[in-house]
Amino acid sequence: MSTGKIAQVVGPVVDVAFATDDKLPEINNALVVYKDGDKSQRIVLEVALELGDGLVRTIAMESTDGLTRGLEVFDTGRAISVPVGKETLGRVFNVLGDTIDLDKPFAEDAERQPIHKKAPSFDDLSTSTEILETGIKVIDLLAPYLKGGKVGLFGGAGVGKTVLIQELIHNIAQEHGGISVFTGVGERTREGNDLYWEMKESGVIEKTAMVFGQMNEPPGARMRVALTGLTIAEYFRDVEGQDVLLFIDNIFRFTQAGSEVSALLGRMPSAVGYQPTLATEMGQLQERITSTKKGSVTSIQAIYVPADDYTDPAPATAFAHLDSTTNLERRLTQMGIYPAVDPLASSSRALSPEIVGQEHYDVATEVQHVLQRYRELQDIIAILGMDELSDEEKTLVGRARRIQFFLSQNFNVAEQFTGQPGSYVPVAETVRGFKEILEGKYDELPEDAFRSVGAIEDVVEKAKNMGV
């Protein structure tokens, strides 16, 4: 194990000098330094550049407070390695695989795997076309998720990305008994804490491993924490043969951390100040999130859209890797429609008759057609009023408004805030409900009866309670 000494510390960047006759550590190797020689105060550095003359530039995974020039640095001879396997379920980790919940730490001999790996080879990949039922009507009907696919949750600040992720974790664990890995990348510590306790109370935590590198962490940790979560998920897929759900909240923060690291390493910035290696870094992460013949990793990634600008390089680069997109729209939150999923902007390559079936496909496309026509008529309604519409158009507008409200529903994870019990709606029930609305079966019921309910029977029940 080669040993070097700290040459300089500039924020999270640490330069380490090795003797020129020593073997230099490889790129991505983990180096360890002990503050004041105290073995309990370990700081891990990751090699990023080799500068020549035995000097390497590293990025710290923790705060560099207390590091001084001349401190000894040890090369571990391998990349950062994190615990994997069933023991990770119900636990919370940081980027290094250290437990940060209040439970006992992992045994020294626990199985570990490096966070840097190659993507599965082409002949190991599987091409599954099975739908993953989420119980959320707007998703299951209009932008269904593929098992083993990649899903992007797009939206600006405060439109409900994290709540939607929490509901998906809840539904998958309760209804499918599936294993989930939640990776918090550069988001609020408070939200992570709330999520942990909510999942503990509901019992979902026993099926979930959680990895956090939050806003207060150095950029190196925020950049690598997604790989830590992915490594845990890959083990369940490749060794245990499981179908795993990988949640990443937020993939934009991964890009943002990469941009900070790139600037710290002195690279010339590219478009809008992002790192020149943006597409490469995104590709290295996304290509490992895939389904193999042994199991699958279905990833659901929250993607913050800066200033609601979808042409920004960060969300635009992520777009290229996705099978389904769920777009959250601020206009819908202002109308009180939750989840605020835009039914016309959201899309999925799974929405085809071969995958979802002819009836589902026909109902979904007709719903989109009605909503699109309603959007076109809104300008006329705003200027001239409803009276200028033909009877046929008035009927269409009435149905479109009922559909728009029926696409909303209460969430289980939001019950403590809304006081309303959440609902899980099977796909068959969802398709039947929208088909009957399109057929005009519920034209007489008030629009408010369709707001924030589960199945179509709940609409009828709500209308009765309203005295209709």
Curated annotation (Swiss-Prot):
Main location: membrane
Catalytic activity: ATP + H2O + 4 H(+)(in) = ADP + phosphate + 5 H(+)(out)
GO cellular component, one term: plasma membrane
Compartments where found: Cell membrane
InterPro entries listed in its UniProt record: AAA+_ATPase, ATP-synt_VA_C, ATP_synth_F1_bsu, ATPase_a/bsu_AS, ATPase_alpha/beta_chains, ATPase_F1/V1/A1_a/bsu_N, ATPase_F1/V1/A1_a/bsu_N_sf, ATPase_F1/V1/A1_a/bsu_nucl-bd
Quaternary data: F-type ATPases have 2 components, CF(1) - the catalytic core - and CF(0) - the membrane proton channel. CF(1) has five subunits: alpha(3), beta(3), gamma(1), delta(1), epsilon(1). CF(0) has three main subunits: a(1), b(2) and c(9-12). The alpha and beta chains form an alternating ring which encloses part of the gamma chain. CF(1) is attached to CF(0) by a central stalk formed by the gamma and epsilon chains, while a peripheral stalk is formed by the delta and b chains.
PANTHER family with a match to the protein in the record: ATP SYNTHASE (PTHR15184), ATP SYNTHASE SUBUNIT BETA, MITOCHONDRIAL (PTHR15184:SF71)
Role, per record: Produces ATP from ADP in the presence of a proton gradient across the membrane. The catalytic sites are hosted primarily by the beta subunits.
Annotated family: Belongs to the ATPase alpha/beta chains family.
Protein name according to UniProt: ATP synthase subunit beta
Protein species of origin: Streptococcus mutans serotype c (strain ATCC 700610 / UA159)
Phylogenetic classification of the source organism: Bacteria, Bacillati, Bacillota, Bacilli, Lactobacillales
